[in-house]
Amino acid sequence: MKISLISATSENGVIGNGPDIPWSAKGEQLLFKALTYNQWLLVGRKTFDSMGVLPNRKYAVVSRKGISSSNENVLVFPSIEIALQELSKITDHLYVSGGGQIYNSLIEKADIIHLSTVHVEVEGDINFPKIPENFNLVFEQFFLSNINYTYQIWKKG
């Protein structure tokens, strides 16, 4: 199963401040929507609570608290390991979309990283991990917006 991390970060590495994303760059979330349409998303419980269920996506939520969901597009797992094991039986591609602990746990297992850097420095308590040295930048595009951002694709190799 191919694992892709997808995130937006500030120039100083912040991805969140509690449950909030501390910026709103017009157009940046369209990249997320386009890439994750009809895909499986692996998220932690706090990220899932803050983002809710987006249409045309399936969710694997990791929660040690044993939450449940009646939504047919949401599966809950007690650990990342069990989630990966079970998801490998039903999909060949998984998008990891947060939060910080999930990114830190899976960045070494990722095959691809989709990263938007929003050109602003903000305060926050959740940071994206350092991209490992065995990843190579294979694509980069700058976007003009109310807050400019750069979208990058990194591949393990």
Swiss-Prot record:
It is an enzyme of class 1 (oxidoreductase). GO terms for biological process: dihydrofolate metabolic process; folic acid metabolic process; one-carbon metabolic process; response to antibiotic; response to methotrexate; tetrahydrofolate biosynthetic process. SUPFAM superfamilies: Dihydrofolate reductase-like. It holds the Pfam family DHFR_1. Pathway: Cofactor biosynthesis; tetrahydrofolate biosynthesis; 5,6,7,8-tetrahydrofolate from 7,8-dihydrofolate: step 1/1. Its EC number is 1.5.1.3. Homodimer. This is Dihydrofolate reductase type 7. The lineage of its organism: Bacteria, Pseudomonadati, Pseudomonadota, Gammaproteobacteria, Enterobacterales.
